[in-house]
Design a protein with these regions (language model features):
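Polar/charged alpha-helical tracts
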Residues: 47-50, 111, 233, 272, ...
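N-terminal non-cleavable signal-anchor helices
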Residues: 205-206, 214-217, 240, 246, ...
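Membrane-interface helix-loop junctions at the exits of transmembrane helices
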Residues: 139, 242-246, 304
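Catalytic-core regions of glycoside hydrolase
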Residues: 1-228, 232, 279-294, 298-299, ...
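Ordered core of a single globular domain
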Residues: 248-301, 359, 363, 382-406
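Polar/charged low-complexity regulatory segments
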Residues: 222-249
C-alpha cells in the first residue's frame, strides 16, 4: 500500500495518524501483517512511518541502483535516517515501460549493493528485490542482482561474467561468445553511476518520425554513453559463433536480442545519413538512405518473428484470452494495443506525453505500426524536394487506426532463430 505515491496530495493530512490508522486496519485483520511499501520520490513520508513499530514494515527501495533512499549520502534522493529503522530491500528498477532494449550498470549495481552492506543501515537490510516495470528483458542484470545476497565479498563484473556465460550456455568453450559479452559489458551494460537514463537505449525504428529524433519515449532521459560499434561487433561475434556452437534456448534468445540491438544501432546511423542528405538537398542520397532505413525496419520485423518473446501475437492473444465473451476480448485487445503505443486517447498521447512510454520493438508492431509512419513521413519529406510544402501528418490518427484493429498475429516462431539472425545480420551489415 503506497499512500501519496506519485503526486498524491498530503496537504491537511496528519501523517502520523494516517500511518497508524493504516497499520491498525491491517493488524485488525491479521495481527502478523507486514506493511510493504515502495520508496519512490518523497514517499513513504518519514512522518508517516517513523512512529510505527520496527518489524511491522518492509520498504522496497525501488531505485537502489540509481537513486537509493536507504541512506546513501551521495544519492539525489538521500534520506539521512534511511527508513527510520524499518526493514528494507535493495531493489533494482532498471526497466521502465517494459521497453525492448539492452541496458545495465553491471559494476555500479555491485558497488551500490556492497556500499549498503557496509553501511550502518545493513542491520535492517533484509535482501534484494527486482522492481522493474516490465520484465522479459536484460536477463543478465536480473541474474546479477539475484546472486548478490549469496556472495559475502564484493566482486568485479569481469570474473562474474565468465561464470554467467558458462552457466547460461553450458560449457561451450567458444572465445567469440566470451568476447561478445565482454564488448557488451563494456558498452550497453557498462553504464556508470553518472548515467541516469530511465531504462534501455531506445530504437530509432520505434520513434515518431522527425528530423531531430533522439529518444522514443518522452521519459527516457536517454544518454550516449557507449560506442554503438561495440554492440555491432558483439552481434557479429555471436552470429559467427552460431555456426560453431550448439545453440540452447538461452543462446538463441541472446543471439536474437543482441542482433536486434545491433540492427537498431545501425538504423540510427542510417537515420543520421537521412537527415544529412535532406539538409544538403541531396535527393539521390535521400532516396537511397530512406529506402535502406525502411528495409532495415522490415528486416528487423522478420528476424523477430523467429522468437515468440519478440512477437506482438502472444501479447494480444494473452489479452484476448482474458475475456469471457467476444466483446470483452475485443476490449482487452484494444487495451493491449493501446498500452504499447498511444497509452490512451489523443489527450493522453499528445498532451500527457505518455505515447510510446511502453513501446515495443516487436514483430508485427514494427511492420504494421512503425513502418507506415516512417514511410508516410519520408514521402512527405520527398515531396518538398519538388517545391511542395511539407505535409502536416496527424500521427495520432495513424496510430489510433492500428489500436482499433483486430487482425490476428502469429504467436509461434515463424522460423529458425539462428538462421533468421544469420540472414538478418548479413542483409543489414553485408557480413
Amino acid at each position: 500500500m503506497d499512500p501519496f505515491h506519485e503526486g498524491g496530495n498530503a496537504g491537511g493530512v496528519d501523517l502520523r495518524k494516517a500511518g497508524e490508522a493504516i497499520m491498525g486496519a491491517m493488524k485488525a485483520v491479521n495481527p502478523n501483517a507486514v506493511w510493504v511499501v515502495q520508496a519512490w520520490g518523497a514517499c513513504p513520508y518519514p512522518a508517516m512511518i517513523k512512529h510505527l513499530n520496527n518489524g511491522d514494515m518492509l520498504v522496497l527501495d525501488l531505485y537502489s541502483e540509481n537513486r537509493p533512499q536507504w541512506g546513501d549520502p551521495e544519492s539525489t534522493w538521500y534520506r539521512k535516517e534511511g527508513f527510520n529503522g524499518h526493514d528494507w530491500a535493495f531493489c533494482m528498477l532498471l526497466n521502465f515501460g517494459g521497453n525492448v532494449g539492452m541496458f545495465g550498470k553491471l559494476q555500479h549495481v555491485v558497488d551500490e549493493y556492497y556500499k549498503a552492506r557496509q553501511s550502518k543501515f545493513v542491520s535492517t537490510m533484509k535482501g534484494v528485490g527486482l522492481t522493474m516495470e516490465g520484465i522479459e528483458n536484460n536477463p543478465i542484470m536480473y541474474e546479477l542482482v539475484s546472486e548478490l545476497p549469496w556472495r559475502e565479498n564484493k566482486f568485479g563484473w569481469q570474473e562474474w561474467l565468465n561464470s554467467y556465460v558458462e552457466a547460461r550456455y553450458g560449457n561451450i568453450n567458444n572465445t567469440k561468445v566470451h568476447d561478445a559479452w565482454m564488448l557488451l559489458a563494456r558498452s550497453v551494460y557498462g553504464a556508470s553511476d553518472k548515467v541516469l537514463e530511465q531504462g534501455c537505449h531506445e530504437s530509432v525504428l520505434c520513434a515518431r518520425p522527425a528530423l531531430d529524433v533522439y529518444q522514443v519515449s518522452s521519459w527516457s532521459e536517454m544518454e550516449e554513453f557507449y560506442n554503438p560499434d561495440d554492440v555491432i561487433r558483439a552481434a557479429q561475434l555471436m552470429v559467427e559463433a552460431s555456426h560453431e556452437v550448439k545453440a540452447n534456448a538461452n543462446f538463441r534468445y541472446d543471439l536474437i536480442d543482441i542482433t536486434r540491438q545491433a540492427i537498431a544501432e545501425q538504423a540510427r546511423y542510417v537515420y543520421d545519413e537521412i537527415v544529412a542528405a535532406y539538409k544538403a538537398k541531396d535527393r539521390k542520397m535521400f532516396d537511397y538512405t530512406t529506402k535502406r532505413f525502411l528495409d532495415i525496419l522490415l528486416q528487423q520485423d522478420r528476424m523477430l518473428s523467429s522468437m515468440p518473446d519478440f512477437m506482438v501475437g502472444g501479447w494480444i492473444r494473452s489479452a484476448r484470452n482474458l475475456g469471457t465473451n467476444a466483446q470483452e476480448s475485443d476490449h482487452y485487445e484494444w487495451n493491449a494495443r493501446v498500452q504499447i503505443t498511444t497509452w490512451g486517447n489523443r489527450n493522453a498521447a499528445e498532451k500527457g506525453g505518455l505515447r510510446e512510454y511502453a513501446h515495443k520493438e516487436w514483430n508485427g508492431v514494427l511492420a504494421d505500426f512503425y513502418y507506415p509512419r516512417w514511410k508516410a513521413y519520408f514521402e512527405a519529406l520527398a515531396a518538398t524536394f519538388d517545391g511542395k510544402p511539407m505535409k502536416q501528418l496527424d500521427f495520432y490518427a495513424m496510430d489510433e487506426k492500428w489500436t482499433l484493429l483486430h487482425n490476428v498475429y502469429p504467436y509461434e516462431a515463424q522460423g529458425n532463430p539462428v538462421e533468421f539472425a544469420q540472414t538478418a545480420f548479413e542483409n543489414v551489415f553485408g557480413k
